[in-house]
Amino acid sequence: MTASSTKPGPTPCAPRSTGAHAPAPAPAASTPGAPSYHRLTRLSPVLGVRCAPPRRGGGWLPAADLTARPEAVCELIAHDARQGLARYGRPLRPDVAAGFGLHRFVWPVSLLFTLPWFLERRVPLLALGDVSLRRRTDTVELTVRPTGFACLPGDPASGSPQARTAADEQALAAELRCALGGFLAPVLSAFGPQVRRGPRVLWAMATDAVVEGLWYAGGLLGERDRARAELSALLAPGEPAHAPGRPGACGDPAPAPAPFTPGAGFAPPAPGRGGASTARGAGEDASGTDRARASCCLVYTVEPRDMCGGCPRVMRR
C-alpha cells in the first residue's frame, strides 16, 4: 500500500530482542512504543518511524496541520492525484483521490498505536501534535513523540507517571480503540468534504486502513495469524465498551468497537468469488483466508480491472 523509508533516522529508537509478548523495559530504558517502531523500521521496505518532535519543511507535514489548515488536506490529496495520473494515465475523480489520500494517511499512522499494543501491550496516547509524516512516491516516513501510554498491571513501567494502567486485556483493547479513535476523528472530519462520504463510511475506510496496516506488519514479523486473531478480537461486534473512568479515557456506552466498523472482515473465501488482490486492500493470506473490506476504495472508477480481492463489491454480493 503506502510506502516509506527503511532508515530509522538520525535518532533511532532503541532495538529490543525480546518476544512479541515480553514485558516492555522499565520506564527509564525506552520511550513508549520505541522498540516496536524500531522493529517496524528495520523490517519494512515502505515505512520508517523515528522518535522525534514533529517536523515541517522538506516535504514533512505535521499531522496537526490537517485540522488547522484546510490547504494541508488539499496538498495530500494533490499528491495522490499526481500518483494516480502517473499510474493510470488518466486523472482520478477528486473524491477518489481524496479517499486514497485518507487511506494512505491512516494506514501508516494507525501503526503508531496498534503495533506497540501488539508487540509490547502498550498503547501510546498520542495527539495530532505528536506526529508528522513525509510521503514520497513509494515510501512514508513518520516522526512520533510518545509521552503517556496505557499498559497492563504487570508492565514494569506501570508505576511511571507516564503510565495509565488498564485492568486487563479487554480494558487495554478499549484504551487502544479510544486513543486511536480520538486521534483519527478530527482527521476524518477534515477529509470528509473532499472524500464526499458520511461519517459511517469514513469510519469504515479508517477501519480498513487500521486492519490492513497491522496485518501487513504481522506478516513482516512472521505473526500474521496472530495479527488476524487479535484484530478480530479488537473489532469484535456486540461487546459493551469499557469505561475506564479516568480523565481522558473513553467512558462511552456505545457497543464496541465504536466508532470503528464492527468486525475485522476475516472469513473463509466464498466459492466462486474472484477479484485480484492489490496493494490497496488485503486479499488472500498464506492460510487461504480472505478479508472482506468494510469500504470500497473506488479504484474501479479509473481502472475497472484493478479491483481489490476483498472489495465489498466482490465479497458481499
Regions from the language model: what does each represent?
Residues 1-7, 310-317:
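Short amphipathic alpha-helical segments
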Residues 293-316:
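Local cysteine-cluster metal-coordination motifs and their immediate loop/turn environment
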Residues 65, 70-285:
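Hydrophobic, aromatic-lined core segments that form the binding pocket/scaffold
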Residues 1-100:
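Generic N-terminal leader/targeting and pre-domain segments
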